[in-house]
């Protein structure tokens, strides 16, 4: 790709704050986004920002008892746009952003901090029940139906209670009809497990040898195509999920980012699933593109189908902070527009140009 046609990562707006930020999410169908974090006095901070010309306007700010760790709009309809959050007290809550005095849904999901949350089934184009998945330090992964808050609809707990691994991230996928749905979970010892929610069992598992900080399917609402797994020690892996071999599982390609920092997460572009942004612990954003191989599956000597991994190409990178980029989210409505938060207590809005040329 020549230099002229290369996508550029540009910072559009920058706002310094006095709160520690952990996550940010665009409100679907608007020019607004939500940031989630913690005030210095260990209380929760939920802020709504709006793009207004060359400025970033604070629309709403609310303080809650427990610091917020993560959030998602995945289980909410486009009409309601309700935000689901996980906090340091182990609670899952759903908020109506027009009235944040009381949550519309509360459940005690974990004994301590909710490390990650993901939602699925809320949008009109998706399939299946609107569900939230959470994971925590107790090693448990729990799935919640937003229409009932008394108990989780599924729970995957450690087999050995004496050897509990911290579960750091969860991600929904394979939700291409009303029955099928899968859930990925990543653990601090490098385990990656794929749970089949229809069968209620582990469908596949592997170990990537480094703690798993982030995971994402390229699309939630299609028959699973591929997913990214981000790790400590500057590594990430992309697994081809189309073909599962009975013994070898999914084929994968591994990549190391140059700086040697932790890879906090990978976010696939909503308008093009082959492009994804990797956020790193050195404050860099790396833009990658996945290239499929000529043949996506081959037959092994037993006649079983075996997946073939593609390759990843770094399109560009940009340093936007001196601290780790903890949260990153693409705008679902405007291609290339993104918001991100880093541990330097600042929120940034940026744009990636020329994505239509990749």
From Swiss-Prot:
SMART domains named among the record's database cross-references: WD40
Native organism: Chlamydomonas reinhardtii (Chlamydomonas smithii)
Any one GO BP annotation for this protein: axonemal dynein complex assembly
Pfam families to which the protein is assigned, alphabetical: WD40
Transmembrane segments: none
Domain of life where this protein originates: Eukaryota
Coiled coil: none
Name of this protein: Dynein axonemal assembly factor 10
GO cellular component: dynein axonemal particle
Knockout-associated phenotype: Mutants show ciliary loss with disappearance of axonemal dynein arms and diminishment of dynein arm heavy chains in the cytoplasm. They have reduced beat frequency and dyskinetic motion of the remaining ventral cilia.
Keywords per UniProt: Apoptosis, Cytoplasm, Repeat, WD repeat
Subunit structure: Interacts with PIH1D1; the interaction associates DNAAF10 with the R2TP complex. Interacts with several dynein axonemal assembly factors.
Entry function: Key assembly factor specifically required for the stability of axonemal dynein heavy chains in cytoplasm.
Gene name of this polypeptide: dnaaf10
Location of the protein in the cell: Dynein axonemal particle
Chain positions of WD repeats: 63-105, 109-154, 162-205, 207-249, 258-298, 320-358
Gene3D superfamilies assigned: YVTN repeat-like/Quinoprotein amine dehydrogenase
InterPro entries assigned: WD40/YVTN_repeat-like_dom_sf, WD40_repeat_dom_sf, WD40_rpt
MF-aspect GO terms: ubiquitin binding
């Amino acid at each position: 790709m020549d230099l002229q046609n290369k996508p550029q990562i540009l910072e559009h707006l920058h706002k310094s704050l006095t709160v520690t930020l952990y996550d940010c999410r665009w409100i679907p169908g608007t020019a607004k986004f939500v940031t989630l974090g913690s005030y210095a006095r260990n209380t929760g901070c939920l802020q709504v920002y709006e793009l207004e010309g060359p400025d970033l306007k604070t629309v709403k700010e609310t303080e809650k008892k427990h610091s917020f760790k993560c959030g998602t709009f995945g289980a909410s309809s486009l009409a309601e746009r309700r935000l689901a959050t996980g906090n340091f007290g182990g609670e899952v809550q759903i908020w109506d952003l027009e009235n944040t005095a009381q949550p519309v849904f509360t459940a005690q999901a974990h004994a301590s901090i909710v490390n990650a949350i993901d939602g699925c089934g809320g949008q009109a184009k998706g399939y299946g029940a609107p569900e939230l998945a959470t994971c925590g330090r107790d090693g448990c992964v729990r799935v919640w139906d937003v229409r009932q808050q008394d108990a989780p609809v599924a729970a995957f707990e450690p087999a050995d209670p004496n050897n509990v691994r911290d579960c750091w991230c969860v991600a929904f996928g394979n939700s291409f009809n009303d029955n099928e749905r899968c859930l990925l979970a990543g653990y601090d010892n490098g385990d990656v497990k794929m749970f089949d929610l229809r069968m209620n069992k582990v469908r596949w598992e592997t170990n990537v040898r480094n703690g798993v900080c982030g995971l994402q399917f390229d699309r939630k609402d299609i028959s699973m195509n591929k997913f990214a797994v981000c790790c400590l020690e500057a590594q990430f892996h992309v697994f081809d999920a189309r073909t599962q071999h009975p013994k070898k599982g999914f084929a994968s390609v591994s990549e190391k980012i140059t700086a040697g920092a932790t890879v906090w997460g990978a976010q696939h572009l909503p308008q093009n699933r082959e492009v994804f942004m990797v956020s790193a612990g050195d404050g860099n954003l790396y833009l990658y593109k996945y290239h499929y191989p000529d043949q996506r599956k081959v037959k092994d000597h037993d006649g079983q189908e075996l997946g073939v991994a593609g390759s990843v190409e770094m399109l560009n990178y940009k340093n936007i902070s001196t601290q780790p980029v903890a949260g990153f989210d693409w705008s679902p409505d405007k291609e290339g527009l993104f918001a991100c938060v880093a541990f330097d207590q600042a929120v940034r809005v940026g744009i990636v140009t020329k994505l239509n040329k990749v």
